[in-house]
Amino acid sequence: ADMIIERLGHSAQNDTQICYSREPSEALETGGGIHNALPLIKSDPFIVVNGDIWTDYNFANLHKPLPKLAHLVLVQNPDHNPKGDFSLRGSDVIANDTGHPSSLTFSGIGVYRAELFEKCTPGRFALAPLLHQAIAAGTVSGEMYSGRWMDVGSPVNLRAAQAKAEELIKSGS
């Protein structure tokens, strides 16, 4: 965390303010981390992007009204998650256990309303169970993204992404 703060400081280009939400010594996981950061988030809804993905997704696509509690960007299942996480029925995200034939993987890109986290207790908790509750209530929309996306959360996946990036640079893509 200190290296990120040292590198980026508290402002970026175009007078953007950067705020940091420090976690205690025990990592809070994604849900707990978002909940911990809510007092710093000035907009509702807000975008969350996992730090361990590589993508060319156009984030401007997320700048539209959000009628539900969450909107998830889903991708084709990578080798490390062949069964996927969720499915889509139109623009509604549904659970994989509904028998839907085409499961997809959560990309780590989502738009959320603070209301999704209202009943959560501060501390460590995963985002997935909270999303499953919201999906069961019909309050999560989604989209399927078919562009470039890779999970770089392991050394093997990071090396694969680096190789892909080098390949794209060489080809001029």
Regions found by a protein language model. Give the residues of each.
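Conserved N-terminal catalytic core of the sugar/cofactor nucleotidyltransferase
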Residues: 1-50, 119, 171
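Short, conserved catalytic or adaptor-binding loops enriched in Gly and charged residues
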Residues: 9-14, 87-88, 133-135
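Basic phosphate/pyrophosphate-binding loop/patch that engages nucleotide-derived ligands
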Residues: 11, 39-45, 55-89
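Residue-level signal for beta-strand positions within conserved beta-sheet cores that form or flank
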Residues: 14-16, 82, 138
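Conserved beta-strand segments of alpha/beta enzyme cores
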Residues: 17-19, 69, 139-141
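Catalytic-core segments of class I nucleotidyltransferases/pyrophosphorylases
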Residues: 47, 54, 59-64, 77-80, ...
